[in-house]
Amino acid sequence: MSTTLKNAAHLSESAQVDSGSVQPFTRSQKIYVQGSRPDIRVPMREITLDVTPTDFGGEINAPVTVYDTSGPYTDPNVIIDVRKGLADVRSPWIDSRNDTERLAGLSSNFGQQRLSDAELTALRFAHVRNPRRANAGANVSQMHYARQGIITAEMEYVAIRENMKLQEARAAGLRTQQNAGHSFGASIPKEITAEFVREEIARGRAIIPANINHVELEPMIIGRNFLVKINGNIGNSALGSSIEEEVAKLTWGIRWGSDTVMDLSTGKHIHETREWIIRNSPVPIGTVPIYQALEKVGGAAEDLTWELFRDTLIEQAEQGVDYFTIHAGVLLRYVPLTAKRVTGIVSRGGSIMAKWCLAHHQENFLYTHFEDICEIMKAYDVSFSLGDGLRPGSIADANDAAQFGELETLGELTKIAWKHDVQTMIEGPGHVPMQLIKENMDKQLECCDEAPFYTLGPLTTDIAPGYDHITSGIGAAMIGWFGCAMLCYVTPKEHLGLPNKDDVKTGIITYKIAAHAADLAKGHPGAQIRDNALSKARFEFRWEDQFNLGLDPDTARSYHDETLPKDSAKVAHFCSMCGPKFCSMKITQEVREYAANQRIEAVDVDVAKGLAEQAERFKQEGSQLYKKV
């Protein structure tokens, strides 16, 4: 039910964390890897494995370390209170750079109005800090520091995070061999160092979305030479969902692996909802500011102004939004190119700006004021996510003149943003059939000079409403392999309705599979360790390890237990699919045991000799496949 002022209890008193989001994973523990200073503590999840059964040699299996986006929520040593928000992680790092000031209060007009409205007290997050801003004339972006040759704490943090204790895994004897990858020109090193991170950010090939007002953030990096990331969307609408439900979706989404979260709220109380989300988020938060700006003018796109939009940017930057989707590439001359499309303009932001351009017959004010926007971005270190407002909404419209015209403009805007040392990534489609996906990636790399690409799927067919997490997961895996840096998840409810918690989880797991498959295909160092460990556990019938090493242990365990629920089945050398007599892995073990007992190694020599004799006889008789008898 939607939160209203009439029935809302004081959220600052009543709000509770989602119980499912704070449960530790079975046989896992939160570990922290310390950096060069005591306050750089990088979280990871360590999965403890059982000893190999004596039938298979009785080997001790080292724990497996995996990337963890769940923040403090899965650390049993941390007391979670969503009413107070998460602990401050970054303030000491920001203070040490001595280039920001603490403001006396909010500087946006809208923010001040909301704060002074007593009727909103019931909904308001109670522990709001005064915002920071760059000192006059200063630039506080990670790109600016990188281009000055400075390795920030955030850069060191993400380097440690990306490596996931790879050296220790090798030393512990984990199977680290992996198939050779094909990276399509990416420059993936054998080890991620802080200096490599700095170089990639300075070059514009990677970004660390990290607003100076999002001090609860655990930094992460987005770029084609790093692990492929995924984004999950949340947000209320005019038709439903409360603030507490959106915070629950946030914590639930990051539990299952969402690297960033976009708040796409379009209903009431957008400002208050966003404050609760950011204060409780350990991952970067993105928004589409034009959505809130449109709410401020009652939904009339033609009434939007630069002044109102500017105030919205400042309002959100002071709350701590880490990246903004800005549809500055929707130019007046591109709008007619969409007229003959099957599905026209499907981006909400794109359609808003197209309507404004036509109503005023003027150029998009986001384009004409782009350098003004850059000034705001670098004062708070908000990253650009340059929106693809003309993305195709059906495979029939893929790779058309409107889409690629806008992409070329986004490349132009990227260079302007880089001139201001503002971190930038590029949004992409959409609906694209498989044979056209690589062209999208190649053109983006060319137009945008390798700025990180961030795509919605793409969906590879339009015939599967209710299953678009699958149609898009196919495209996501492909474009991730080709070089896309972040994949925006799609849930089963895409095109159908607002997703619930189960839909969020399904979308995230689907996209974690796609991202991981892309990492394997690119040959990212250490990407196959988890696969190898799970395969070994499967062959040795270590059922609990199979469950716990998977992306979704709960579902794997429940599927197994549907037919074999007893604890004794957890040590059985078969599952219900094949049963005890037809398990291929059990049969393989029996063959190995027989070979060992019968000294098959010696027999192999005789077999090879016999095969060689038969081959020579075949040649001597004329190499004829068939003979008359």
UniProtKB/Swiss-Prot annotation:
Residues recorded as binding substrate, renumbered to this chain, are 233, 262, 291, 327, 347-349, 388-391, 427, 454
Gene Ontology molecular function, alphabetical: 4 iron, 4 sulfur cluster binding; carbon-carbon lyase activity; zinc ion binding
Signal sequence interval, chain numbering: none
Which GO terms fall under biological process for this protein?
thiamine biosynthetic process; thiamine diphosphate biosynthetic process
Superkingdom: Bacteria
Q: Which residues bind Zn(2+)?
A: 431, 495
- What does the protein in this record do? Catalyzes the synthesis of the hydroxymethylpyrimidine phosphate (HMP-P) moiety of thiamine from aminoimidazole ribotide (AIR) in a radical S-adenosyl-L-methionine (SAM)-dependent reaction.
Describe how the cofactor binds: Binds 1 [4Fe-4S] cluster per subunit. The cluster is coordinated with 3 cysteines and an exchangeable S-adenosyl-L-methionine.
What PANTHER family does the record tag this protein with?
A: PHOSPHOMETHYLPYRIMIDINE SYNTHASE, CHLOROPLASTIC, THIAMINE BIOSYNTHESIS PROTEIN THIC
> Which cofactors does this protein require?
[4Fe-4S] cluster
User: NCBIfam families annotated for this entry?
Assistant: PRK09284.1, PRK13352.1, thiC
For region Disordered, the annotated ranges are: 1-20
Q: What name appears for this protein in its UniProt entry?
A: Phosphomethylpyrimidine synthase
Q: Keywords in UniProt for this one? A: 4Fe-4S, Iron, Iron-sulfur, Lyase, Metal-binding, S-adenosyl-L-methionine, Thiamine biosynthesis, Zinc
Which catalysed reactions does the entry list for this protein?
Answer: 5-amino-1-(5-phospho-beta-D-ribosyl)imidazole + S-adenosyl-L-methionine = 4-amino-2-methyl-5-(phosphooxymethyl)pyrimidine + CO + 5'-deoxyadenosine + formate + L-methionine + 3 H(+)
Q: Which GO terms describe its cellular component?
A: cytosol
Q: Which Gene3D superfamilies match?
A: 6.10.250.620, Radical SAM ThiC family, central domain
Q: Quote the record's binding site residues for [4Fe-4S] cluster.
A: 575, 578, 583
